[in-house]
Amino acid sequence: MVPAVAGAFLLGFSSIFTGLNMVVTIHKFKPKGMGWFKMPLSLWGIYATAVIQVLATPVLGLTLLLLFVERIVGIGIFDPALGGDPVLFQHFFWFYSHPAVYIMILPAMAVMSELITVFAKKHIFGYSFIAYSSIGLALLSFLVWGHHMFVSGQSTLANMVFSALTFSVAIPSAIKVFNWIATLYKADIHLDSPMIWALMFILLFAIGGLTGIFLGTLNVDVHLHDTYFVVSHFHYVMMGSALIAFFGALHYWWPKMTGKMYAEKPAVIMALMVFFSFNLTFLPQFVMGARGMPRRYFDYDPRFELMHQLSSLGAFIMGVTLFCILMNLLISLKTGKKAPANPWGGTTLEWQTSSPPPLYNFPVGQPIPLPELYEYDNLVKDEVNGGWHYKKDDAATEA
C-alpha cells in the first residue's frame, strides 16, 4: 500500500502543475483584443477546472502524506486501532473527490457550450451567465462534500447544511442547461454527429442532475445510499455527461486535429446506438436501487434478474458500439476526405487556420485573425468544396 500512496502523492503534483499551467496560459497568452468576455466559453470551463485542480488537489496530497506517516511511523490518525478517526479520512477524501467530479464535468459543459451554438448557428444565449456559472460551480464544489457522508455518523446539523448546499449546486447547472435550450429555440439546427452527442448530453445530464435531488434529500438518501440508484446516478452524470461530451468533442475537433473527415452517417447511427444502449444499461438500475438492490454485491435477489439481464445486454451493445466509433475515426485517417479549414462553421480561433493547424497554429510574426465570437451571419456554406467561409474578407478583424 505504501508504494501506491507514494505514487498517488506524486501524481497529485502533475494535476496541480497542469492547473497552474492552464491558469497562467489563459491570463498571459490571450491574443491581443481578446478580453475576458470575448473568450470562448470552452476557456471559461477550462479556467474553472484549473482553479479546482490547484485548490483541491493539495488536500488529497496532504491526506496521502498523513496516511503514509500513519503506516510508516504508527501514529494514529485514521486507524481506530491506533486511536485515529476513519471519519476524518472520509472528510479529507471527499473534500477532494467531490470537486474532482467537477474537474471532469466542467470541461464537458464547456464543450457543450461550443457545440450547441455552432450547430444551432445562433449566438449563445446568456454568454455571461454561462461563464459565471462555471466559476460558481467551481466554488460550490468545495462546499458539498458532506453529502457523501449522510449515513457515516456526522452531526444532524452538518447533514442539514450539506443537504441545503447540495441543492444550491442545481442553480448554476440549471443556468447552463436553460441557456443551451434557449440557444436551440427557433435555431437553424444542423444535426451533424457532434450535435447529436450534444443533444444526448443535455437529456442525460438532466436525468443525472434530477436523480441527484433524491440523493441530496436526507431521509431519501438513507434508503438509497449504497444502492444501484447511486451507481446509475453516477454514471448518468459521469459517463452520460462527461464521456458523451468527450465523444462529441472528439467528433467536433477530429477534422481539425487530423485534417481528415470521418464517415458522417455511420457516426450519427453509432451515436444514437450509444444513447439507446446507455439507457438500456442504466435505467433499470434506478429501479433496482429504489427497490433495495445494494451495490458491490456479486449476487442478487431473483426478482432483479430481468433488470440485470437488460443492463448487461445494454452494456455489451454499448461496448461494441464504442469500438465501432473508434474504428470509424481511425479508418478516416487512411480513407477520409481532406477536411476543410472550417468544416462546421465555427467562429473560434482554431477554425481560422488550416486543418490540421501548422506549427504554432498561425504564421509567426503575423497578426492573429480575431473573428466575432459566436456570430454566424457572415458565414456561408461552401456546397462544392465543403466547409464554411466568411462572406467578406474583412469579416474577421485582425488583432
List the predicted regions and their residue ranges.
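Membrane-embedded and interfacial regions of multi-pass energy-transducing membrane proteins
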Residues: 1-399
